[in-house]
């Protein structure tokens, strides 16, 4: 059967030992923009990978995830992978702010897109119920980025369907449940700006108790827990489904071993969102008005974080047909004072609600647009690191590692810190693999980047910040 045009297949050369079948792990990584299925061997090497866009259905009751399309793609891809290796585990890794309401048969309502605009009147009602920031470390966010608001809206708008729900499943656990039939809850998805969790106490929030949702959440399981075997697929009858994890937290897993989380350092996980997770940063620095929050890592510990929609904003600034720039393009924009001022996405970030704009001479070529996008994302990342009080080395993971200049510009903006680029472009995939091999820490391969020599960069940075805070 030919593969659909929306899927991208990436085969890898596979070495079979004579007389042996390769044992492998599958990581299902569902990001907001794309979904990816990766087959990895026992050493973490990629054997095969397939991707497809993660699309939102705008029709129906409300904008929602096309779960059936993803399910059909997943089943077809698993069948292909089963012919390449013996799959012993499947690990779901997904974006946050998403949950499924299910009964024993399946979804009772479509899974709401967190970028949906919800009624302001209802949001005002919800504001009276949500826990204080000091308890949840979850800021009030636009659209449906607070999962508690999504659930409140669904309960008020579709009470009959909501009443049928047996479980509320955060998104990684929905896919685990769909694969193996075992319902579970897990702290990394409960603890990412949901209003549902108290990170410092490790318990459900007052909102959950007020709404009487506690019985709907299945028992808590560790992200690495094997929930059960895959159902309904004889080729995968010996394959265990793991509980799964929130994608940004998957990128942090390698830093949780051997008490590494106690040493000051920052992981900048990049994709649709750029999320700075600062180990050792103080939680009392978090500003709920600036999209600062505490995510909860796989061990249940709060980690100070700040974020902006870096991948989304980069795409807007770089244009529909991005062309990688040269250092000369970046230097030219710095010299002429071309600035991109936040923000260029409608959801989240410290400057949400402000309209992005360009001041100074406009970029003229595709390469200059790419250069401006790179400068903007580096300046935003630098701003977030300062706000967090992030100390120690910085490691960039995810999609920005493909940008040949981003980390070098960031290093130039932060002369007191090492800025490294992970050689594993997908920290989420590595993190998913680690859950199946818990305790087997892969070698951390990262390249410390030399700061890009740019005349006038310090003045350019000061000018950018002066525009953001004109009275400062």
Predicted regions mapped to residue ranges:
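Short glycine/serine/threonine-rich phosphate/pyrophosphate-binding segments
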Residues: 94, 148, 251-252
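N-terminal glycine/serine-rich phosphate-binding loop of ATP-dependent small-molecule kinases
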Residues: 3-111, 120-121, 135, 164, ...
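Short, acidic/turn-prone active-site loops that include or flank metal/cofactor-
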Residues: 52-57, 113-120, 191, 272-274, ...
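Active-site core segments that coordinate phosphate-bearing ligands/cofactors
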Residues: 27, 127-139, 152-165, 170, ...
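Short alpha-helix plus adjacent loop in nuclease-associated cores
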Residues: 116-131
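A conserved helix-loop-beta module that forms one wall/lid of the active-site cleft
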Residues: 209-225
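Conserved phosphate-binding loops in N-terminal lobes of ATP-dependent enzymes
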Residues: 36, 76-89, 144-153, 158-159, ...
């Amino acid at each position: 059967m030919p593969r659909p045009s929306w899927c991208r297949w990436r085969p890898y050369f596979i070495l079979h030992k004579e007389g042996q079948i390769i044992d492998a792990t599958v990581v299902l990584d569902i990001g907001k923009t794309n979904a990816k299925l990766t087959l990895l061997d026992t050493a973490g090497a990629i054997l095969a990978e397939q991707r497809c866009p993660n699309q939102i259905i705008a029709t129906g009751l409300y904008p929602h995830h096309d779960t059936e399309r993803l399910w059909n793609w997943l089943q077809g891809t698993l069948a292909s992978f089963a012919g390449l290796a013996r799959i012993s585990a499947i690990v779901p890794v997904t974006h946050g702010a998403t949950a499924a309401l299910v009964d024993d048969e399946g979804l009772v309502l479509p899974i709401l897109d967190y970028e949906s605009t919800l009624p302001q009147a209802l949001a005002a009602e919800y504001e009276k119920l949500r826990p204080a920031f000091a308890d949840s470390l979850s800021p009030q966010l636009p659209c449906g980025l607070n999962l508690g608001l999504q659930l409140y809206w669904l309960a008020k708008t579709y009470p009959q369907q909501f009443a049928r729900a047996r479980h509320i499943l955060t998104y990684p656990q929905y896919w685990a449940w769909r694969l193996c039939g075992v319902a579970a809850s897990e702290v990394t998805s409960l603890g990412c700006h949901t209003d549902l969790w108290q990170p410092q106490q490790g318990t459900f929030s007052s909102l959950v108790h007020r709404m009487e949702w506690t019985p709907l959440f299945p028992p808590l399981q560790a992200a690495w827990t094997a929930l059960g075997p895959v159902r309904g697929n004889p080729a995968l009858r010996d394959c265990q489904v793991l509980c799964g994890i929130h994608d940004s937290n998957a990128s942090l897993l390698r830093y949780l071993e051997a008490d590494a989380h106690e040493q000051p350092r920052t992981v900048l996980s990049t994709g649709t969102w750029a999320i700075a997770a600062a180990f050792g940063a103080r939680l009392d620095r978090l500003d709920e008005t600036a999209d600062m929050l505490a995510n909860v890592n796989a061990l249940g510990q709060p980690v100070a974080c700040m974020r902006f929609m870096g991948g989304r904003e980069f795409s807007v600034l770089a244009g529909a047909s991005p062309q990688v720039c040269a250092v000369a393009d970046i230097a030219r924009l710095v010299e002429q004072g071309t600035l991109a001022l936040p923000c260029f996405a409608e959801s989240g970030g410290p400057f949400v609600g402000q309209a992005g704009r360009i001041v100074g001479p406009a970029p003229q070529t595709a390469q200059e647009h790419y250069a401006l996008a790179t400068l903007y994302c580096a300046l935003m990342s630098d701003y977030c690191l300062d706000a967090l009080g992030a100390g120690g080395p910085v490691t960039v993971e995810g999609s920005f590692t493909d940008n040949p200049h981003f980390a070098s510009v960031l290093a130039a903006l932060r002369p007191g810190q090492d800025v490294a680029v992970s050689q594993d472009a997908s920290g989420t995939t590595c993190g998913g693999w680690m859950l199946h091999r818990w305790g087997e820490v892969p070698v951390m391969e990262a390249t410390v980047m030399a700061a890009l020599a740019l005349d006038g960069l310090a003045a350019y940075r000061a000018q950018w910040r002066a525009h953001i805070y004109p009275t400062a």
